[in-house]
Amino acid sequence: MREKLSICLGSLIALSSVPLRVYIVTDGPSADVARQVLADASAKASSDVLAELLHVDDMLAPLLDLISFLQPHFSSAGYYSKKLFFLSTGVHRLFPEGVRHLILLDIDLQLRSDIALLHHHFALFPTGTIMGLGYELQPVYRHGLHKYRQEHPGTTCGEPPPRGNPGFNSGVVLIDLEAVRNSSTYKKFLSAEGVEFLVKKYSFRGNLGDQDFYSLLGWERPELFYVLPCTWNRQLCEWWRYHGYADVFDEYHRCNGSVHIYHGNCNSSIPSVR
């Protein structure tokens, strides 16, 4: 984890042309490591960096009501069972109203471009949009929606772009906190009843935390989401290529253009900088 955090923070800070306000969510044992990594990265900063470490338990305590109905549907006994993977769904509760925009980043990322360029995508959100995420670049939800897709021939849910919506990946999330707070639609679905409706309609049982919820909500109410270009979350994992989906894998995994953020999910190696 230390190496991943070092790569992510180091690239974020080194390439930023604007002052940064950075929040690192951590636990007690990891806090000292995070402080050292942050100090090392900040030494190479070209802009001001204001950083704060937030304890995961303090962040999650106000969200336990949400987690209580999300976790049974969108987690397993493995890595993604941790409550941390539902933090983004209620993060609008945790920041004061003066904070309008938030960019959430996994730590298994390496930036190749200035984060200010990513922030510019907030200006592209249509009215009513609350979040921006890139598509999932594997047929994860083609698999997860197998029953729904059998019962609804011709559906675009779980299909690769451009003809369909393959679901989202939450490695990079742009959140308009004000829009989330003002969205009656989001509030409606971020409830025990709303989640139950979604999982029943789509015959879905997931294990990837918040991105499962966003994917379901994106199929049901696509107007809530801005689709971030794949180059801002260029996922590298190819697990599904070797587990039953080799024939369609490239349709999902294709991502043309200069990569701004590499995402080394499932411990994939990130290409070296040339």
Where are these regions (language model features)?
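Glycosyltransferase catalytic domains, chiefly GT-A lineage
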Residues: M1-R274
